[in-house]
């Protein structure tokens, strides 16, 4: 008897998962990948050799569980952040996990959940509502200004009126690229009833001071999350972390799975941190390339949202999906983030950006492009 292959509809899924699609950017084999905001500069030979040696050293103990609390890695992260932000931090201020998404999930497991709510200011990072849904946290949202910047007055009012347990702010914001000032964060923190999560995935690119500066000032209200997947060029290593007061770090111990960070991940990440200066040396070059791309797009007649990250949001296309397909047909993969009329492009290597700009100039001569020169917003 042949039994039909079951589908998702045949499974006893939770109701809130029915009809959903898995999250994830396209992974296609094309010459130019500018869709996931990675650092395009590969690791140095010295870093690769260090990772190999470090992993080889722990491999003899792979029959044993790793350090459950990743103390040595967290100490290294604290030292890195102290040097990077100028704010003295210790191991007690740091928590680490498999990418910043796991960090965000743990935060909502601890501070969200059934009967609680989280608010975001859209468009922003699309995983925030997905993680809220996955933890049964009610998702609330307020729309950003027409230029995609955060309307702080509206945000303060929304938080004061709706009293969410968790507030999400991405700075720089993905997909628009704007950062928020410490003064504006203080205004929000003064009305936040629960915790404010400042998602600094692109923090190393930002021209503004890190929100880490506010941890001592608002010890029970603020958590800063970061990743090594962007400027730090360690996307394949899958490491995210948070910075907070020790009590908030302790809360993560209540929800984290035991031995969640493998000994291989911990060893490789510690090796990568030893080469932080070399890796982050590419940030200035990427910012310069971002500005070159921005000026070129504006010259072609596109509207470009000023960015403080390693990507640009640009438009306004009459048919964003058609424009995205044209880029792909020329071997350039960028991101359609679902904002009508806009696409997002990662800043790549100079030759990758040249290919992107060539495709952009072709689109500028078609009916897909803006009808008039709008310039930077």
Curated annotation (Swiss-Prot):
Which GO BP terms sit in this record? L-histidine biosynthetic process
Pathway as given in its UniProt record: Amino-acid biosynthesis; L-histidine biosynthesis; L-histidine from 5-phospho-alpha-D-ribose 1-diphosphate: step 7/9
CDD domains the UniProt entry points to: AAT_like
Task: Identify the Pfam families for this entry.
Answer: Aminotran_1_2
* Claim: Amino-acid biosynthesis is one of the keywords in the record: yes
Under HAMAP family, the record lists: HisC_aminotrans_2
* Identification of the protein by name: Histidinol-phosphate aminotransferase
Organism in which the protein naturally occurs = Mycobacterium leprae (strain TN)
Phylogenetic placement of the source organism: Bacteria, Bacillati, Actinomycetota, Actinomycetes, Mycobacteriales
